[in-house]
Structure formats: C-alpha cells, structure tokens
Amino acid sequence: MRVFFFPNSSMAILSVFLSLLLLSLPLPSTQDLNADRTALLSLRSAVGGRTFRWNIKQTSPCNWAGVKCESNRVTALRLPGVALSGDIPEGIFGNLTQLRTLSLRLNALSGSLPKDLSTSSNLRHLYLQGNRFSGEIPEVLFSLSHLVRLNLASNSFTGEISSGFTNLTKLKTLFLENNQLSGSIPDLDLPLVQFNVSNNSLNGSIPKNLQRFESDSFLQTSLCGKPLKLCPDEETVPSQPTSGGNRTPPSVEGSEEKKKKNKLSGGAIAGIVIGCVVGFALIVLILMVLCRKKSNKRSRAVDISTIKQQEPEIPGDKEAVDNGNVYSVSAAAAAAMTGNGKASEGNGPATKKLVFFGNATKVFDLEDLLRASAEVLGKGTFGTAYKAVLDAVTVVAVKRLKDVMMADKEFKEKIELVGAMDHENLVPLRAYYFSRDEKLLVYDFMPMGSLSALLHGNRGAGRSPLNWDVRSRIAIGAARGLDYLHSQGTSTSHGNIKSSNILLTKSHDAKVSDFGLAQLVGSSATNPNRATGYRAPEVTDPKRVSQKGDVYSFGVVLLELITGKAPSNSVMNEEGVDLPRWVKSVARDEWRREVFDSELLSLATDEEEMMAEMVQLGLECTSQHPDQRPEMSEVVRKMENLRPYSGSDQVNEAD
C-alpha cells in the first residue's frame, strides 16, 4: 500500500481553501435571525393590520416597528391595537424561539391559539386581551414555565379554568375576565399579584389561595365565599345532634324540677307581650318619621331646576359643596330627567332606555340608574358628572351633557364612534341615554379621581407626595391613550386635554376621559377660556380642534406633572405668561432649583436627568408653531426610551 504525503505548499493551499469554505457558510446566529424574519413576514401575511409598515428590503427585522432584538434574535414583538385580524396559523412561533414578550392586545384576532406557541419557551409576558380568540384555553400555555404576565381578558374563551395553570409557578398576573368560562376555579397555588375572572359563568366557592384578592376580581359571577358573600353551606349553622331511640337522659328528673321552677306565670307573660307590642309600635312610629324626612330631602334633590340653580362653578375633578356638605342627589337628577323637571315627552319608548356599546354586559338599566344614590363629582367643560352607586359592587360615573343641539340620528352616529374607542388608557364609555332634553353618558367610575386633584389637592402636612415613578407612568399612560385616539384618523382629536381629564385607577394607571365630546356640544360649552393654560395659541374656535392642539395641551400637562404647578395659576400678567413660557425662560442649569417640584426633589434624587429630558420634551410639545410639535406617536417613543420598562410597567401591562 502506498502512502502519499502532501508537500507543505499543498497543505497550506488546502488549509486556506477549507478556511474560506467555513467563512462562506452562514453563521448560526444569522440563520436564526433570518428564521425570525421569515416568521414575522408570515405573521404579517396572515393577519396584517394597518400599521405593518415594515421595510422588507431590510435584511434585519430588528428595526421594524414593534420588534425588539437582543443578541441578534427577536426577543419582543409588540403590536397592540393595529387592526390585526383573522387566525394565527401554525408554524410562526415555532421559529421565534427567543421571544420573551408578545403583545397582540386590542386587535381582532380570532380562532384558537396556535399550538406551536409552546416552542416559545422563553416567553415571560403574553398580552392577548381584547381579541376574539375562542375555544378552550389551550394546554400549550401551561408548558410556558417562565411566564410571569398572562392576559387573556375580553376574548371568547370557553370551558373550565384548567388546573394546568399551577404549572406556571412564576406567574404573577392572570387576567381572564370578560370571557365565557364556566365551572369552578381550581385551587391555584401561585405567586399571583394581579388576578381577575369577572364576567364569566363561574360558580362554586372561591379557593382559599385566591381569597386575598378584592371583590372586584370576581364581579358578575356566581361564585361565593370570601371576599364575596358566604356560600350556602357556610351560612347554615349545624344543628346539635339528637339522641337516638327513646332513651331518657340521666338528669331527666332534675330537669323536670327546673322546668317547674322556671315556668312563668300568666301575668308575667301578659306583661312581656304588652311590652313587645308597645316597643314595636314605637319603632314603627320612629321609622315613619325618618322616612318622611328622607322623602322630603330626596324630593328636593330631584327638583332639577333647584339643582341647576345650586350647582356651583367648580373644576371638573372636585365635588360640589354647599355649606360644607356634598350634594346628595338621586340618580334621577343625575340621569333621565328633563330640563323642566318632567320626563321627556314625544320621544317614544326608545328614548326611555340606556343604549349599551358592543358586547358590554348589561348589568343595569335606566330604572336602576334612577333608583341609585348619587353625588355630584363636579361640573366640567361639557356638563356635570355624578357618581352613581347602583349596588354594593357596581359604581358608575354619569355625565349629564349640556348644550347638545343635534338630532337623535346625528348624536347616535357621533357617540357610537366614541363608544367604539377601546384602549386601556381611555375611560371606557359603557352606555348612553338620549332624549329631547337629556343626554347622558355612562362611564366606568375611576376611584382615584383626576390627576389635577392628586397634584393640586391637599399639599399640606399628611399628604403623600407622588414620586417620579408614578408621575412618569401616568405621563406615559396618558400619552398612549392620546396616541391611540390620533391613530384612528387624521381628523380624530381630543380637543380638551388637561390634568382634570386624566383620571386614575387604584394603581395610578392613567385613563384619558372626555374624548370625542368636543364635537357633540355647542360653542358656549366649549368656550376656550374654560381651558386656560392648556389651549394651544392657534386655537381660537373651540369647535375646530386638531391633533397638534392636543400635542400642545399634553405638553402643558407634562410640564404640570414635573413642576407641580397648575397652568391656570401661572398667568402672571395681562400678557399671559403661561406655564410653558415660564419654564422656557428659566436656564436649564436652574431647573433643579426653579422648575422641578420640591416634592419630587425629596424623592427622586437619582432621576433628575430623566426629569430634565421630560421637561425638554414638554417644551417641544408646546412649541408656538404647530408644525414644529412632534406627533403623539413620537412623543410616546421618546418617553418610553427615557423611562425603560420596569417591573411596575410590566405589572400594569405598559407594553
């Protein structure tokens, strides 16, 4: 056998050739990113919405809107509210193996969840709320062991809540409300911080591990037990066991003697009966007197003309007070009453009911609203707002519009556009009532009131100041809500952005209110002087609102958040030195001493640079020239870059 040896020169040539061959092969990371890119393009083809403006000429998807990459892999896909529709096909998520955050919320996606979602085993945050997914919650979800946040609310999922959720041992948020789930809730021993199963056909008792959540986590179900009412078997007091047979207790003779001794005479019994009758009569008499007083008080409150005369001019976020007492009005005053104190005439029976939007659960009607107790929350630009308490768990806000001069058909067309707005940073409009003399809007009640009240309320001793984390989260939430409004079309704007129209949930999530109302009311109601300090300089006609005007108003709110100063209090002379001009007049190196709210400085020593950048953004938004102001989408992007996602953002789904 012959053995051939290559000369040194031949070996060198071979080594170079092999090296070049290896270099010409695609790197594994490049292959993976290409697979991610292919998967994203497949998703676009299947369910593409209006904002899929991806530049497919780019070889890397990492610069596409909503896509985030790390180490040359797609790790986050955020496409909320971009009109995605249809079923998600199999084979997409099988390639997105490094995905950690997936947000497809507030779209129109339907069908069942794809089975290959389980291959995205690194998923930590999954936001699918506000779609049309149906069928049972798939078992594939329970293999995502790293999942921390899961939101499947407001879909059409059916079946029971699986005990497979117990596999998700890191889960802190589970939202399943507004589906069609049935059966009982399994005992979920999980480190949950947020949990909600409201508006489902659930029954049985609430497991012990979930009883730590408040009652609003279980609304509109047939569940029982803490924190809701006791279950029937818990209410029943077990009777004492009786002895069987005819056995005579050993102490029967002694008990017979006691019975004789304790037996009451006829006179004593008669005295007791007479005393009870007299006592009962006194109680009835007292109740009649109290009811008469209450009836008189209520009838006075229902007199709409009296209420009109007494309602004071107050900011929209404060309560109306007379002689130190909050006006207590029935919902008849807050609801379907006419301007002359009589029921609306000539409008037909159709005007005598509340009209609910979309698939909103009709948990009450106009009669319930009329019977509810209510109180005046405040009088704002578009009318008076009331808090109506329907029952122990249902509280709504009713806005009684003024100066609405339009026909039923036109009002219906415009208000249905408002009711169709659906975003987590907007106060949802649940229902409306229309008659010749009354126009009412029913919203979710926001328990924390407005940003204005929180910023400018009691600033004395005992006040809990807002730290920078909360303020910046409020700012981003409000910006997202306004950006959503603007995304509905170039002609869609708010027209009345101010801190009293930014309402807050218990967890200080911002929700923009009063959107879409500027086009409903007359010019007298939208007098621009009512928005002193927030109005863009080019706005002279309150009916001609614009998106650039909204950006200006939002910039004022942003400066208000950082300075702690109310814009209406910043006018120093007849020329109107408003808040933006005052901030601009202060040199940047003096902002810490002159501009920043002193409450912030005592709490946020590490975030002053971020605060300064937010001030700069507020000044950009309040440019005197509309064309120099950024779009709200750009404002949101800049704010998110300034304030990276934190744990609190994730808990509140700021994705």
UniProtKB/Swiss-Prot annotation:
Domain of life here? Eukaryota
Compartment list: Cell membrane
Q: Describe the disruption phenotype.
A: No visible phenotype. Probably due to the redundancy with other receptor-like kinases.
Start and stop residues of the LRR repeats: 71-95, 98-120, 122-144, 146-169, 170-192, 194-215
Alphabetized InterPro entries for the sequence: At_inactive_RLKs (IPR050994), Kinase-like_dom_sf (IPR011009), Leu-rich_rpt (IPR001611), LRR_dom_sf (IPR032675), LRR_N_plant-typ (IPR013210), Prot_kinase_dom (IPR000719), Protein_kinase_ATP_BS (IPR017441), Ser-Thr/Tyr_kinase_cat_dom (IPR001245)
Predominant localisation class? membrane
Write out the biased-composition intervals (Polar residues).
237-249
* Keywords (A to Z) from UniProt: ATP-binding, Cell membrane, Leucine-rich repeat, Membrane, Nucleotide-binding, Phosphoprotein, Receptor, Repeat, Signal, Transmembrane, Transmembrane helix
- Start and end residues of each Protein kinase domain: 371-646
Q: Could you say which tissues express the protein in this record?
A: Highly expressed in seedlings and leaves. Lower expression in roots, stems, flowers and siliques. Detected in the vascular tissues of roots, in the trichomes of young rosettes leaves and hydathodes, in the floral abscission zones, in filament apex and stomata cells of anthers, in inflorescence stems and in sepals.
- The name under which this protein is listed is Probable inactive receptor kinase At1g48480
Q: Which organism is it from?
A: Arabidopsis thaliana
